[in-house]
Structures are given as C-alpha cells and as structure tokens.
C-alpha cells in the first residue's frame, strides 16, 4: 500500500479524517489528502487528539478559507508543537511551504510517520505507520503543486472532528439548566406541549438568574479582597448589570405567565430586547476575561486556592469560575430557540403572530451577539497581520475586514517589470508587501476609495502561469497597477473580492433618498433606521448617513426614509461619482447639450489635463450625455449613460448619437408579446434550465421583462427603459432590446445578479432540447429548505446574498454560531440563520 494511503488510515484512526472522506475512495489521489491538510486546521486538531490541550485552539484559525497568511500560521503552530511537546527533531519536520505550496508532500508524510511513532502517539493504542513495506510513491509527489486548487471551497464535513469550545460551554449551560424529569401524559396534546414550553422558559430563567447571583455572591465579592479593582472589572465585566436586568426580567416574566394563556409574554421579550443589549459588551470581553483570569490564577497561588474554595462553596466544585463566565453567552443565544418551540405549539393565530414578534426580537439579539464573537475573531486576525507587517504605521482595523491575502506579481506606472509581492486586501485598502521569511515589508499602501478595477484578459494563456491579470486604476488616471496571478481561478477569486470591497465602500443606494451613506463603526449597539433590526458586530457594523446620521444595513440603504438634512450643501467633501448623483444630475437635462455615441474606447490614458476632474471610462457603443462641451476644446465632460459615471474624455472618442427606428421584435424566437408573469411561468415551468422569453408588460406597454427558467424556478428580470436605452442594471445600457438579449446570450447574468449564474440559452419558441442528467456520486447533500424573511447583502465572496422570499437550500448548519451554509440558483455561501424561516411552509 502506498505510504500516503497508510497515512490516511492512521489519520482516520486518530479521528482527524472522517472514515467516509473522499480521500478513502477507490479513485482517490494523493492531492486530495494534501488539500485536506493544507490549511493546518486538522493537523492542529491531530495533536490535541493525541495529547489533550497540546495546542490552545483559540490560537488556531479554524476557518482560514485558504488565506495563505492564516494557513501558514496554523502549520507553523503544528510544527513548533511537534518539536516542543512531542519531541520530534528539527530534521524530522517539514517546512511550512512544503505543505501549503505542496513543494514536498513526501516530507509531510515523513513527519506524520515520525509523529505516529512517538511514545505519546503510541500510548493512544493506534498502530503507527508504515507497518508494511510501502509501494514506492515518490513520483506521485512531483507536480502536486500544479494540481492543488487554491480556490476550492471548504469541505465542511472535514471540520466535524474539530473541537468546538462553544460546545464545551454549552455542556456547562445544559448541566446547570437540567431539571428533575416531570411525569408526562401518555399522549400529549398541542396544549400540553405548549405548557411544557412555558414551564421550561420560566424554570431555566430562574436557574440562570440564580447562576448570575451565585457568580456575584460566591466569586465576585470574596475575590474583591484578593484582586485589584481593575482585575475585578476585567474578569467580571458587567455581571452585576446582567443580574439586575434579569431579576426584573424574571419578575415580569412570572407576572405574564400568570395571565390566562400567557398572552402578554411576548411583550416582556420585546421590551427587554433593548435592555439585553448590555450583552454586547459582555460577549465582546468574556474571552479576554477568561484569559486574564487564567493569568492571574497562574501568577498567584493564593488566588488559585481562593478560586477553588469559591467553587466548592458555590456548587460543590462542579463548575469553576471560568466555566460559569461562559454561561451568560449561552443563555442569550437560547431565548430564540425556546420561543421557536413555543410558536410551534401555539394554536391561536393572534398569539402565534405576537410570539413571532418576540421570536424576531430574540433572533436579532442572538445574531448580534454571534457577530460580536465573529468580529472578535476577525480583529485577532487583523492583529496578526499588523504584527507581521513592518513599516506599517496605521491601524488596519480602520480599513475594514480582511477579504483575501496571498502571493501575486505586480507592475506599476513607476516600475514596468513584474515584481514578486504579497498582498493583503481589506474592505478599504490594499497592502502590497515583500515577504521576508515570516514577516512582510510594506512597499505600498493603496487606499481603495479612489481606485477602480478593470479586467484585462488579453495576455492570458491557459497553460502558462502568471499571465492572468487585471488592472487597478486610480480615478484620476495618475496611478495604476497591473496585478498578475498564478491561475485564472485565483485571478477570478481576487477580482471578486476587489469588486466586493469596492461595493462595500460605494454600495448600491448609498445616495438614495438624499442620503450620503458611508461605512461606519458604531461605538454603541445601534438599530437600522429602515428595518429596526440591530447592526451586527463590533466594527464597521453598517452605514451611517454623513448628513442626518441615520444608521442602516447595507441591504437596507434603499429603504431608509428621506434624509432630513438633504438641503444642506456638503460640496466641500469630494466623493467618487456613483449612481444616483444628486444636484449635478438634476441639472443635466436643463443644459440642452446633445448625446454622443462612443466610437473609440478610453480608459484614462492620456489623463485629463491639469486637475479639471476625473476621467470617464468609455466603451464603443456607450451613450454619453454631455454636461460641459465647447467646440474649440479637446476635452469634454459627460455622463456615461451605460454606467452613470461622470468625468472628462477626449472629444475625438465620440460621435453624434442617432436614435434608430423602432425594432420589429416579433421576428425573434424569444419574443412573447404582451404577457403577465403567470403566463410566462406556465410556459417555462416544464422547460429546461436556461430557457427564456422576453415579454411586454401588460400594465405598461412601454416596459419589458425577461423571464428565465433557472435552477428549477422561473425568475423575472425587469428591463428598464430610459433615455432611449435598455438596461437590466445601471452598470450597462443598450441601444435596443435585441442588442441587450444578444449580449446576455454570450455573457452571464451573474454580473447583474450574483445568484443568477447563467446566460440566456434557449429561446422559448425553439424545440425543447432536454438532456438527461445522471446524479453524480459527489452531489451536494441538502438538509431542507428555508425561506428568506429579509434581504441580506453579502460582505465578501464567502457569504450568500438573500432577497426576501428566496427559497434557500440548506447545506450546512455547522458554521460559526448563527450562520448557515446554503445555495440559491447555483450560488453557495454563508448567511445569517435568523434571516430565514426554516420549514416555513408549516407556519405560513
């Protein structure tokens, strides 16, 4: 048996790889084992399985998503622990890049073999390897780096075996809340079940409030005589505030439960949602509190002895203070689950609706708490970046969340030769560094506020590395970079993250209703002005209007009521031109200047002279509405109707626009004439995916819509008509309906709608061409469906945007708390679980 297969068998015995993982299949290749180990997560868990607590998993990034920086950090943690705690020699250890870049996977197997023969590993009773003469497999390791896919999605099942500290805290919580079993009637009615739910809500609240009282009475007060005031504040945070709030909450809960049918219980939860916001502070600091407690107890034996004494008095030594400090976080995440069960067994329609309001409030609170924890992890990641980058004199946390990092090649206006660089991309900045061992030397700091991304595939060669490139261009055209990537897939991954970062800086609807929304970090927990739900996390939780200071989620910007201060002049702040321009746009139709058609492309070279303004990107066929133009001047200003951007361009790149005669659409196989949505759905429901039609809207004969069958559903896309042009997105406009359809027959709709990754394939009047698809062995498992209750706007490419009413296929519930993995229209990603209603048909 090949050595790598023996290694796989050993990893399964160590409970690191699932027994059914694809690396065990008959046709498995060694590259699949390499891919499973590359991020270092399973290797760190391996050491903890062999020697409990060998590695503090708080120091391991459990979801590195193939970030080179985080993966290498995990791998180096594994290697240093092998040396320090398992006694491996330096010569027995592989180098970090031997695994991450798969430069020498044979050495990785050799290290794992040496680990399997250590006394610690053998004490687990697991047979080391090799135990038999292995087939020579040195040849299969060569060329592995070319087979590894840097863009592969995480295999969620792989991480089932990774310890979860939250689950550990959950066990303490469940133990504390456990009640004596109550005799149940042999056949329970819905009323009986509802009574059980109400009883559980009250009993667990009583026990939780007692637990808070015990922490204060048996730990906090006795330790005040041993610890400095600042130590007490760090360790116990705002426990006393939590106790006060829950004492009142329990009193009002009991009063509500005493009413017939507990009909006012929902009001208590809604009322206390705002008071429970103090959990934001507690949950953001509890991890630091636990670490500080450990440090103090380790440094002072008298404190350690006092902690043991306190634990004995409080609960006979069953739970330590460290255990109990995790309970508040667990409790606040349980309210929505308790209410969800109560809603399920409530029959009265009005009571059910009222309880749903309480359920929404507690779901929102739980999601807010989960995002605080998630952001704490993100801030740790940013701190690791910060400490590893030399010559960096500003805080990276001011530039948003990390999006992607890794190696690339780069050219700039100053240096045309390709340079090897390492880049870190955040929401608002790109850091270009030179790697020096484990550290990075900052070479350039690019503020993305003034840059745009443009694809350039002209020099790409499929089988040639580092030919896949896109441009990063400054708005003024004075500075720019060419970024080169090893593979087309990596280029696509980076480009998507750049586009997501820029959309976070300049989101759609940022200037809707007279507002001026910008990304913002709120110091206090804040609710969205549009949907009233909480803004999530600890930094850059959402957007704030620079004028009226209204807070909002990214997905809610278009629904915020009109700005209360839209009449004020804020022209002193220069901003990137984006859709929905305000004062300038209102004047443009009053100027009486003609429209022009672009006859030659222009991308900023040569740049506009002096400092007259930004350049305007032009593509042949675009229509430009002039805003400043004099016949004797070589440079004109205009608005590109296709993109809504405003800027300057050479006048010789355009010609007068001539509006053509109306098109005869009936000759096209895709044109259906006047038709409602229902008619389109009846035609397309039983057709193949990709079948489409264009219909005239019955209510307004001047408007059209595309209906397309995609992923078993019929989707409808409104075609907007204005200024003689047709468009389905503000990014691109067409002179005619035929041109629009022809374009999207060749180009995917996902550029307009991220979840609609298809072209317009089959006109509905064509004969059906149905292919028989056999289910593949690796087809995706689905754990049910859910209906989106609200819009959700993804912040990076790992997340899944939702529109209210979307039906989501649930693929996984094992992500970070509060996040599920799902699929819509072929697009897969993570979304907040409180934004959907699972098994919604039962409650609708």
Swiss-Prot record:
GO terms for molecular function: guanyl-nucleotide exchange factor activity; phosphorylation-dependent protein binding; phosphotyrosine residue binding; zinc ion binding. It comes from the Eukaryota. InterPro entries: CAMSAP-like_CH_dom (IPR022613), CH_dom (IPR001715), CH_dom_sf (IPR036872), DBL_dom_sf (IPR035899), DH_dom (IPR000219), GDS_CDC24_CS (IPR001331), PE/DAG-bd (IPR002219), PH-like_dom_sf (IPR011993). GO terms for cellular component: cell-cell junction; cytoplasm. CDD domains: C1_VAV1, CH_VAV1, PH_Vav, RhoGEF, SH2_Vav1, SH3_VAV1_1, SH3_VAV1_2. Residues 670-764 form the SH2 domain. The modification Phosphotyrosine is found at residues 825, 843. Interacts with SHB. Interacts with APS, DOCK2, GRB2, GRB3, DOCK2, SLA, TEC and ZNF655/VIK. Interacts with SIAH2; without leading to its degradation. Associates with BLNK, PLCG1, GRB2 and NCK1 in a B-cell antigen receptor-dependent fashion. Interacts with CBLB; which inhibits tyrosine phosphorylation and down-regulates activity. May interact with CCPG1. Interacts with CLNK. Interacts with THEMIS2. Interacts with NEK3 and this interaction is prolactin-dependent. Interacts with ITK. Interacts with PTK2B/PYK2. Interacts with HCK. Interacts with PTK2B/PYK2. Interacts (via SH2 domain) with SYK. 'Vav' stands for the sixth letter of the Hebrew alphabet. Couples tyrosine kinase signals with the activation of the Rho/Rac GTPases, thus leading to cell differentiation and/or proliferation. This is Proto-oncogene vav. The gene is VAV1.
